[in-house]
């Protein structure tokens, strides 16, 4: 039986090929993570010139801080809303475009447009539309007697940042979902249709199980996106307000480190966030991926 394992003429060539990625990983991932862990155990002055080892005092103070605990639960709620809303909406549009025969190319282009917009620009766009005084959407809502002011209403502020974050991520999710649906053999779809399965039943019984690997991949990607890459949206749209209603962990790390100049607390919070994401990712790979069947 022949082996498909590649054979290199030089024993050092595989290491040479891996070296650039290894260097990037060490410089931009492992080293900063190690620095954050070290600073989290220190009491550092605002300019970082002097430090004193304090052990776990920063973490103890962290979990006795009511504002941090509020940000923690806000992050869990915000990430769940962004992740699952983004996946469901993207999958819905991908299924619709996959079902459409005429004009599908136009709809594909339309769905990919948000991907070209920077997160901060996306937030500003929706701020204009939801502006309490002159926004087009708020004017429309006012016609139905609904007052909108996300600067004063915490629920509306959360809706705005979730909506803008989901809108920004739709294109990425749509691209993978649509490609996965297009890769399903047409013969299977036609056979299911001949057996009497309607479009909805074909989707849930045939298409959805076949795209499970892609769905799992997007679940992990969207979770990381919600934890880290939504910072520009929150900063531009609400700045964490009102009354810290939209302050997530990543935004609180920024406020502590760059606004409050408390490097030790900021480092401790970043370490907690790092381990939280690692735990959630491991749980997903352990329990969610076990339900996925790769073919």
UniProtKB/Swiss-Prot annotation:
The chain crosses the membrane at residues 12-32, 81-101, 110-130, 158-178, 208-228, 263-283. It comes from the Bacteria. CDD domains: TM_PBP2. GO terms for cellular component: plasma membrane. SUPFAM superfamilies: MetI-like. PROSITE patterns: ABC_TM1. The keyword Ligase does not apply. Residues 33-80, 131-157, 229-262 are periplasmic. Belongs to the binding-protein-dependent transport system permease family. UgpAE subfamily. NCBIfam families: PRK10561.1. This is sn-glycerol-3-phosphate transport system permease protein UgpA. It comes from Salmonella typhi.
């Amino acid at each position: 039986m022949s082996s498909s394992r590649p054979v290199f003429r030089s024993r050092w060539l595989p290491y040479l090929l891996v070296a650039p990625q290894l260097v990037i990983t060490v410089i931009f991932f492992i080293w900063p993570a190690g620095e954050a862990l070290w600073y989290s155990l220190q009491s550092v002055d605002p300019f970082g010139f002097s430090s004193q080892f304090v052990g776990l005092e920063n973490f103890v103070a962290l979990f006795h801080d009511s504002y941090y605990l509020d940000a923690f639960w806000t992050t869990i709620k915000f990430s769940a809303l962004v992740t699952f809303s983004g996946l469901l909406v993207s999958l819905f549009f991908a299924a619709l475009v996959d079902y459409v025969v005429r004009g599908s190319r136009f709809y594909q282009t339309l769905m990919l447009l948000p991907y070209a917009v920077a997160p901060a620009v996306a937030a500003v766009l929706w701020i204009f539309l939801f502006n309490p005084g002159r926004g087009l959407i708020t004017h429309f809502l006012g016609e139905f007697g609904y007052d909108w002011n996300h600067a004063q209403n915490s629920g509306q502020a959360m809706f705005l940042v979730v909506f803008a974050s989901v809108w920004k991520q739709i294109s990425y999710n749509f691209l993978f979902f649509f490609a996965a649906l297009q890769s399903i053999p047409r013969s299977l779809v036609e056979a299911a249709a001949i057996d009497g399965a309607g479009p909805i039943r074909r989707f849930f019984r045939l298409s959805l199980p076949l795209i499970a690997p892609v769905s799992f991949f997007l679940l992990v990607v969207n979770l990381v996106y919600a934890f880290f890459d939504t910072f520009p949206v929150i900063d531009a749209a609400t700045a964490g307000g009102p009354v810290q209603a939209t302050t997530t962990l990543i935004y609180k790390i920024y406020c502590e480190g760059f606004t409050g100049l408390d490097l030790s607390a900021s480092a401790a919070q970043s370490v907690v966030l790092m381990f939280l994401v690692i735990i959630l990712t491991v749980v997903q790979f352990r329990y969610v991926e076990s339900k996925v069947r790769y073919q």
